[in-house]
Structures are given as structure tokens and as C-alpha cells.
Amino acid sequence: MRAVPLPAPLLPLLLLALLAAPAARASRAESVSAPWPEPERESRPPPGPGPGNTTRFGSGAAGGSGSSSSNSSGDALVTRISILLRDLPTLKAAVIVAFAFTTLLIACLLLRVFRSGKRLKKTRKYDIITTPAERVEMAPLNEEDDEDEDSTVFDIKYR
């Protein structure tokens, strides 16, 4: 049950398709529907003390410098949120691609660790496999029983 790796040229094409599909869909949806309206900066009264700020926040006192700074930060927050909502399909595709890449990387690393563990067990069991032939000297352990050639056990000495 071995996973078949994707051919090298197919992986970048797959990633490109994942990135391009939501972006193309979003651009088609934007071209069909009306363009996103810009934040209503022209219809709002300028920040500062005046009746516009008092009715907007629902407070009876005239707005001072504190309320004007909260207006500008609120406008900036609305602008940032609207930009994020406009680019939501692209952000979603980017997160999906990053998640897929991370998952693939973790799976490859786990597979590599698992396979190297099998190799280490074989190396410990049959140490002669990984040792160069020039460094191995084999001598029979049971020299007194020379009639049984099949059951001779060898001692490995490293030089």
C-alpha cells in the first residue's frame, strides 16, 4: 500500500489551478455585478466639533478631539474590513494552498522518517550490509566442529 507520488511537472500545474480558479471566479463575479462602492467619505461630515458628530454617536454633548480620532480609526477599520471581504476568495485560496503544501510536506517527512527507521533496523540486524568489504574479516567461531559446514557461525572483526 504505497502512495504514488505525483510527477514533478504535474504538482506546479495543480497548485496553479488551485490558485487561479477562485481568482477567476471572483473576477467574473465582480465584472457581472456592480463594482464595490468606496467607503462613504463624501457624504459624512468632516470630523470635528459640530452637530454631525453628536447625532452620529447618539451622545448629547458636542464631539471633541477624542470623538474625531475614533471616527478616523473607525473609518480605517471599515476600509480594511471591506478590502478583506472583497479579496476573500483569493485569501481563501491562498490559505487552502498553504495548508495543502504544509500537509504534503509533513506527510513526506513522516514517510522519510518511517522508511529510514526500517533501514536502521536492517543495518543493526545485518551489520555487514553497510560495512565496506575491505574492513571486514570473517573467522569461524566454532572451529572444533568442522564437519558441519552449514551451521558454521562467523565472527565479524572490523579493521
UniProtKB/Swiss-Prot annotation:
UniProt keyword list: Cell membrane, Glycoprotein, Golgi apparatus, Membrane, Signal, Transmembrane, Transmembrane helix
Parts of the chain on the Cytoplasmic side: 112-159
Ranges for region Disordered: 30-74
Extracellular face of the membrane: 27-90
Taxonomic superkingdom: Eukaryota
Main location: membrane
Protein location: Cell membrane; Golgi apparatus
Expression induction or repression: Up-regulated by Golgi stress-inducing agent nigericin.
InterPro entries: FAM174-like
Topological category with respect to the lipid bilayer: Single-pass type I membrane protein
GO cellular component, one term: plasma membrane
Membrane-spanning ranges: 91-111
N-terminal signal peptide: 1-26
Keyword Signal listed: yes
One GO process term, biological-process aspect: Golgi organization
Glycosylation sites per record: 53
Family note: Belongs to the FAM174 family.
Role description: Essential for Golgi structural integrity.
Protein name as annotated: Membrane protein FAM174B
Lineage of producing organism: Eukaryota, Metazoa, Chordata, Craniata, Vertebrata
